[in-house]
Amino acid sequence: MQLAKQYIPNDYEPNIYALWETSGALEPTGVGKPYSIIMPPPNANGNLHIGHALDMNLKDILIRYHRMKGDDAVFIPGADHAGFETWVVYERELTKQGKSRFDFSRDQLYSQVWNFVQEKRGNMELQLRALGVSASWKHLTFTLDDKVINTVYDTFKKMWDDNLIYRGERIVNYCTKHQTSFADIEVEHKNEKGKLWKIAYPTLDKIGEIIIATTRPETMLGDIAVAVHPDDERYKKLIGTRILLPIVNKEIPIIADEYVDMSYGTGAVKITPAHDPNDFEIAKRHDLPLESVISPEGKMINVPAQFLGLTPVEARTRVLEALEALELRRGETEIEHAVGHCYKCGSVIEPMIKEQWFIKTQSLAQPAIDALKKEEIAFYPASKRKELIAYLEQLKDWNISRQIPWGIPIPAFVNENDPKDWIFDTRTNEQSIVVNGTTYIREEDTFDTWFSSAQWPYIVTDYLTDGDLANYFPTDMIETGMDIMRAWVSRMIMLSLYRTGKLPFKEVYLHGMVNDEHNQKMSKSKGNVINPMELVAEFGSDATRMGVISGRAPAQSQAFNKGSVIAARNFCNKLWNIARFVEAQIGDNHQIVDLEPQTPADHWIIRQLNDAANNIAVRIEQYRFSEASETVYHTIWDDVADWYIESSKTAINRPLLSWVLATSLKIAHPFAPFVTETIWQTLNYTDGILMREAWPTPEKFDPIAAEQFEQLKLLVAEGRWVIAELPGNKKYRLLYGNDSLIADNQDTIKHLMRLEAIEHTDQPRGLRLAAANREAWLDIDSETLYQHQENLEMRLAEARQKLAGLKKRLENPTYVEKAPAHLVEETREQLAEQEKIITRLVSELEVISLK
């Protein structure tokens, strides 16, 4: 088989992936040191986005590298039922059909969503394959598989028995549109402009008043007290008395509580415990009643007739009008404050009293905190470890129940005659069960998806059941987005320590968000979401993989740059053309034999590839993915293609040329697996596949000879630069004096510099190539040299003018602080480039002046 003239990724990628899969190369071998990474399960019902492409690519680089290093590497895939996210999508489908969730029973809805997800699930797996994700597909775990549900139930039962589970009335974050609660960490807080209204609450004799300040006047209809600080001299005499709640005309007490900030507002706070978490805690301390005025459907309840059935926003307007009529409004102030929203639909979250299932987190968090303080898990970046400790130290109890039918049912049943009598039972497919003559009704809520996801490391490795992957737990590392460090990483650590006594992984690498080209967060509403499959279709999987990691550092969000994908596509084409050149010299019978370097270029390329293989390995192991990829790019493009391949055209060492290509394919494989495997298979390097080849080990070379080629490079590079700057388009002669290196490598220098001739001389003339520090001159006449000098002086003036403009821009604090970060960085890069140009031009002009 022969390499085609052009590399068209779509012609090869599906077949290459099929080869990996059918050969068993994706599966663990049981030979070597176990190395495992789990896949944060993407939503089974959806398409991958560009963030998934980054996430999966980083993990796949590690897996491919460790396979080649001889480790028994396994990438364990997963698919997430994505409880709430999937439910939102399916509710949209029902709406299109003119139906509602309330038209069906819970069991009917579960069955419908199950079928919906199974239809979509294959699409996600196909996309992961298209990205080249080398996962062990026979170990794929779906978050609703029996083994997942059984483990989740076992954990829930253990927590139940350990008195870590409780059901109680608490303030929860509630989305009235989807009618489900959320944990604190799932609420998306947005800074919004609003108003702080001051309202007078009259004393019972209607002579005096207390002024409170609130951003939500509508909730005053549910006030049960006014709180002041016990040390506030303004209100000390009023503590213990009662005051009149406007509109409702109900007497409520004035209480003292140290929570109140005397310096904020008027120092008097309305207490609405059913709709504010802080007020709820105050009410508990003072044994005050709870009065809900907003229903789960987002309507006003238990309020005067004129407000019944209104939305909170509608009620706000009416309440303010009523207060105006009563002459009880005392002004308003424009403010900016954080407002909680549903992270999926954007609705304002309503704090609401609901009976929910909770996990007591204090005893779970402490072992995790202790392990983190002892640095038993390495974090990249290291600063995130302290951030996670701080989060765990103030962690609240975890609300694990969701009011949606799609998910793992909570295995609990309630006595039909006693709402406080709950039992654990896994017969969740039954509406009711009878135990010792008592009928118990099934809990309708499902688990928060994070409760199962938090157990992912020991579930997918079958650690608790001693399955065939049990030896791969704890996993070696977790790589995920910094945005879910708290929601996922923290909980995996807590639950793994609780269930297994072990940490779930040894290292944590957190990547930042992939933003759009303007460095704005991507969202469907903005229409700026990038579909990686479109990039794969246009540029190929390898280009997408290399492009998406370009310039990335841990935990730093960065703009997506399509230019990086194009550059990576060009790199793949360059690698293909290198292979075609080698194929033309050797054919398709590539047997790697003992190397016999013959020229300085031969010794130099061995040194370069030895160094590259080592540097790439170090950078991968330190999670410096972008730097490793850049090393691959420049080693193959610059060292192999531009220098060695070009120099070898004058003296071909075929066995070494074959080794150079093989080594290039190996170091590039973790980053560009498809094109490298395609070349490897086409040129018949071995009977096996590249994915399972060993990572390159150092080969012997002569360092003196290698350094000689480095000196030749300096000479050629300067000669090329000068010739490119000279007027006209002609070939020049190179004159040299007593220089054995030039004398011994004339053919190579002539070819690389595209010279007319090389001649020895005892009478130097022309322009000396001074930067190379050799006795070498370009044979240039005086007129050409003068024109060259004028051109350089003109370019130097232009460069200095550009430099001044760039400096002025960067000295402007408004630009640096307010311009998009990527533009500021581009300006800094342009400034550095101009400084390099100026240095080069000044140096060249100094040589001419010496002449």
Model-derived regions: residue spans:
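N-terminal, positively charged nucleic-acid-binding surface of large information/translation enzymes
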Residues: 1-231, 255, 272-285, 289-304, ...
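Glycine- and acidic
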Residues: 1-3, 40-48, 106-110, 135-142, ...
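Gly/Pro-rich turn-and-neighbor structural signature
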Residues: 20, 147-179, 186-188, 200, ...
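Structured ligand/cofactor/substrate-binding pocket environments in proteins
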Residues: 51-63, 79-80, 148-151, 209-322, ...
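Acidic, turn-prone loop/beta-hairpin segments
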Residues: 80, 176, 182-188, 414, ...
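Core structural elements
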Residues: 128, 570-583, 602-611, 629-649, ...
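Catalytic adenosine-cofactor/nucleotide-binding cores of aminoacyl-tRNA synthetases and other
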Residues: 341-345, 514-518, 522-598, 684-685, ...
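C-terminal low-complexity, glycine/proline- and small-hydrophobic-enriched intrinsically disordered tails
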Residues: 566, 684-851
